[in-house]
Amino acid sequence: MGRRPARCYRQIKGKPYPKSRYCRGVPDPKIRIYDVGMKRKGVDEFPFCVHLVSWEKENVSSEALEAARIACNKYMVKSAGKDAFHLRIRVHPFHVLRINKMLSCAGADRLQTGMRGAFGKALGTCARVAIGQVLLSVRCKDAHGHHAQEALRRAKFKFPGRQKIIVSRKWGFTKFNRADFTKLRQEKRVVPDGVNAKFLSCHGPLANRQPGSAFLPAHY
């Protein structure tokens, strides 16, 4: 018996059903890598960021996530280079899908009980996605921004429903706007922390603050 199409499980029905000690025998998700490209590049290297945002409430299978990751990564490597971007998958397939197998051969009515005890067994996994939730994010240099948008456009065909490609106003994967980040960086109020940035607030002991930054305005 082949794999049941994901269109049968597209609608979100009922509660989340994650893998647990009560839900055993779940197949591993097809997607195993969630960060692709130069994931160790600092926050200053890639200022441009673009998101692929879901515009429907639905289930997205792990096979679709893996197919989108491969399509996006392949185009970015070919067009921008393997050292010029960082791709991140923003959803994880924790929801377990079930199937109540039915026999279709001759004499099947003697072997099975129909809809009696029809809870089903684990078939695969999917991610429960809400409206406005980010599916994929790519950060890169400004010169490769159009390549990143085209890569996400190609990845969009791997998903059901509707998605939108939104260019972020933030600096990379941080929570700061680009203008604010540049200003705070000049004032030395943000410290690079991997792909993110740590904000130095005006709270805490005076002895731990740098000279000249003891009494900063608290509107940030």
Swiss-Prot record:
Component of the small ribosomal subunit. Mature ribosomes consist of a small (40S) and a large (60S) subunit. The 40S subunit contains about 33 different proteins and 1 molecule of RNA (18S). The 60S subunit contains about 49 different proteins and 3 molecules of RNA (25S, 5.8S and 5S). Interacts with NIK1. Interacts with LIMYB. PROSITE patterns: RIBOSOMAL_L10E. Under UV-B conditions, RPL10 proteins interact with several nuclear proteins, including RBG7 (glycine-rich RNA binding protein), which has an important role in mediating innate immune response to pathogens, and BTR1 that specifically binds to tomato mosaic virus (ToMV) genomic RNA and inhibits the local spread of virus. GO terms for cellular component: cytoplasm; cytosolic large ribosomal subunit; cytosolic ribosome; extracellular region; nucleolus; nucleus; plant-type vacuole; ribosome. Induction: Not regulated by UV-B. Its main location: cytoplasm. This is Large ribosomal subunit protein uL16z.
